[in-house]
UniProtKB/Swiss-Prot annotation:
Subunit structure, interactors included: Homotetramer.
Species name: Gallus gallus (Chicken)
Reactions listed under catalytic activity: (6R)-L-erythro-5,6,7,8-tetrahydrobiopterin + L-tryptophan + O2 = 5-hydroxy-L-tryptophan + (4aS,6R)-4a-hydroxy-L-erythro-5,6,7,8-tetrahydrobiopterin
Function comment: Oxidizes L-tryptophan to 5-hydroxy-l-tryptophan in the rate-determining step of serotonin biosynthesis.
Protein name (database record): Tryptophan 5-hydroxylase 1
Domain ACT as annotated: residue spans: 19-94
GO cellular component: neuron projection
Protein encoded by which gene: TPH1
Cofactor(s) the protein requires to work: Fe(2+)
Length: 445
């Protein structure tokens, strides 16, 4: 069982839970050395987990959930910076104790949409903290600008309007280069759903070569189309936190623009990737449903199950292919926002396999190079059905159902909760039956 360390609580009123995430090279003894620093400063570690870095294939990211006071944390933060390559520190309520006996080891997950405030700021990098190989690492003006965007995202709360950004000429020029080059490829590479929705975004959200759309405008557009909304985020989230947002039809979206020195490359998701890669398909009902179901399957799932779901998400929503009119077309956002890999994926030289979650979840995700294999689905509906079957294999002592009226998840774990859902379905079937009856009378059937 995971629980807060309550010892000496009266003598340390400023103690609290904080998440620290840092990167380690894949070498013997690295983790032991880092954890020894926590021991020396008497920092209690409540939870530890590791995952392969999304930025460097040779490194691992370590997440630790700490219970300590601010002075101890500041000391450990400074010590870690001299031993590891990336350090991020944020308040956390990521894990907690569940009261039901069969739920006590279930990781914390948001129950209502406002709970995303508790995990949306758990970014792996913050503001001006860039890797040494980042194109903007030596550009102090760019780093300052990145911190500005990060602060906006970190201060955002559910229900707030997304702040309007006055983009610089340099940022608009960078966006324009990406927009112009990608639009040359979309007619022959993008799926029909993407091509249908892109003109709507031009009309209603200001998608143009000389204009970067505002996230608030995009969020309102998506809300009317599929119920999805946009939430600004400062950078990478953990797979668990990102997928949790999808369960509530919330897409965490960056606002910063990639560095102008190399407009056709970015080592991380930026607003070009989000707006040109993801948004057009989030405006498609079937795709939106597919994305939400992956998110719902992740709630309360084990770390292993979440990683499998995240990998399936990566090879579908980010790098997925589909068949249309007998030809391969792209629907993955990572491809639709990358000129070189978009060309490669349909070049004939790329390796392609049918999408099968049981196989796909074992494939390695590559960040800095082209994928070794791409997975193709016959349709979004087929991909959705396969993911539904795969989700049934995830061991979880309850089911979940999203309630769009309260923007919360219903926990289905007893006959009472199941009966409530059955009553809702019965009412909806009555509506359908009544409509069919009226249609029959009109047709004199």
């Amino acid at each position: 069982m995971i629980e807060d360390n309550k010892e000496n609580k009266d003598h340390a009123p400023e103690r609290g839970r904080t998440a620290i995430i840092f990167s380690l090279k894949n070498e013997v003894g690295g983790l032991v050395k880092a954890l020894k620093l926590f021991q020396e400063k008497h920092v209690n570690l409540v939870h530890i987990e590791s995952r392969k870095s999304k930025r460097r294939n040779s490194e691992f990211e370590i997440f630790v959930d700490c219970d300590s006071n601010r002075e101890q944390l500041n000391e450990i933060f400074q010590l870690l910076k001299s031993h590891v390559s990336i350090v991020s520190m944020n308040p956390t309520e990521h894990f907690n104790v569940q009261e039901d006996g069969d739920m006590e080891n279930i990781p914390w997950y948001p129950k209502k949409i406002s709970d995303l405030d508790k995990c949306a700021n758990r970014v792996l990098m913050y503001g001006s903290d860039l890797d040494a190989d980042h194109p903007g690492f030596k550009d102090n003006v760019y780093r300052k600008r990145r911190k500005y965007f990060a602060d906006l995202a970190m201060n955002y709360k559910h229900g707030d309007p997304i702040p309007e950004i006055e983009f610089t000429e340099e940022e608009i020029k960078t966006w324009g280069t990406v927009y112009r080059e990608l639009n040359k490829l979309y007619p022959t590479h993008a799926c029909r759903e993407y091509l249908k929705n892109l003109p709507l975004l031009t009309k209603y959200c200001g998608y143009r070569e000389d204009n970067i759309p505002q996230l608030e405008d995009v969020s309102r557009f998506l809300k009317e189309r599929t119920g999805f909304t946009i939430r600004p985020v400062a950078g990478y989230l953990s797979p668990r936190d990102f997928l949790a947002g999808l369960a509530f039809r919330v897409f965490h979206c960056t606002q910063y623009v990639r560095h102008s020195s190399d407009p056709l490359y970015t080592p991380e998701p930026d607003t070009c990737h989000e707006l040109l890669g993801h948004v057009p398909l989030l405006a498609e009902p079937s795709f939106a449903q597919f994305s939400q179901e992956i998110g719902l399957a992740s709630l309360g799932a084990s770390d292993e199950a979440v990683q499998k779901l995240a990998t399936c998400y990566f090879f579908t929503v980010e790098f997925g292919l589909c068949k249309q009119e007998g030809q391969l077309r792209v629907y993955g956002a990572g491809l639709l926002s990358s000129i070189s890999e978009l060309k490669h994926s349909l070049s004939g030289s790329a390796k392609v396999k049918p999408f099968d979650p049981k196989v796909t979840c074992k494939q390695e995700c590559l960040i800095t190079t082209f994928q070794e294999v791409y997975f193709v689905s016959e349709s979004f509906e087929e991909a959705k059905e396969k993911m539904r079957e795969f989700a049934k294999t995830i061991k979880r002592p309850f089911g979940v159902k999203y309630n769009p009226y309260t923007q919360s998840v219903q926990i289905l774990k007893d006959t009472k909760s199941i009966a409530s859902v059955v009553n809702e379905l019965r009412h909806e079937l009555d509506i359908v039956s009544d409509a069919l009856s009226k249609m029959g009378k009109q047709l004199e059937v």
